[in-house]
């Protein structure tokens, strides 16, 4: 089963929750842990907003643990994070290759578009873009982190 097909089995999170999941995945990958205070900084929101959102995410089974340092993505949360990251990176490639945007402009533009991409469109983007493994900035797609582990 392809990644987009796997991702569509669970109900899709809201764009706000997708943003949290994406940021939490990056924190876990880069820092080894998800810390609520750091999450508030990265998301640009008040700590109280993060606390409320984490409660909702726990209720909806995107994460486990809601204490300040015991936050972990569930398998469903990780799959959803990978999905939005993949859609974001595919959109960046589309903006570079098709729309000829400079790479430094693609991140913000992709962020506006990533939440609207359906699994069907994601499959088509993967096909058209020849199944990329790295984004235009050189970051690995989820599942391809081994490509950059020695950098």
Predicted regions and their residues:
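N-terminal helix-turn-helix DNA-binding core of bacterial DNA-binding proteins
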Residues: 11-45
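Basic, amphipathic "hinge/linker" alpha-helix immediately C-terminal to the N-terminal HTH DNA-binding motif
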Residues: 69-88
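Basic amphipathic alpha-helical segments that dock to polyanions
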Residues: 20, 39, 50-60
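C-terminal regulatory/oligomerization modules of transcriptional regulators
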Residues: 114-151
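A short, conserved structural fragment
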Residues: 58-68
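Helix-turn-helix DNA-binding elements, focusing on the entry/boundary residues of the two helices
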Residues: 36, 54, 92
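Key DNA-contact positions within bacterial/archaeal DNA-binding proteins
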Residues: 48, 104
């Amino acid at each position: 089963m392809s990644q987009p097909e796997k991702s569509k089995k669970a109900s899709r999170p809201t764009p706000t929750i997708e943003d949290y999941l994406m940021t939490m995945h990056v924190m876990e990958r880069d820092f080894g842990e998800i810390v609520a205070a750091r999450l508030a900084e990265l998301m640009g929101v008040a700590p109280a907003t993060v606390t409320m959102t984490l409660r909702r995410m726990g209720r909806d089974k995107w994460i486990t643990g809601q204490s300040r340092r015991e936050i972990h993505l569930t398998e469903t949360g990780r799959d959803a994070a990978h999905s939005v990251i993949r859609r974001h990176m595919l959109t960046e490639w589309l903006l570079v290759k098709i729309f000829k945007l400079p790479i430094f402009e693609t991140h913000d533009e992709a962020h506006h578009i990533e939440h609207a991409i359906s699994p069907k469109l994601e499959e088509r983007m993967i096909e058209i873009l020849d199944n990329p493994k790295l984004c235009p900035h050189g970051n690995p797609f989820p599942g391809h982190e081994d490509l950059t582990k020695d950098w």
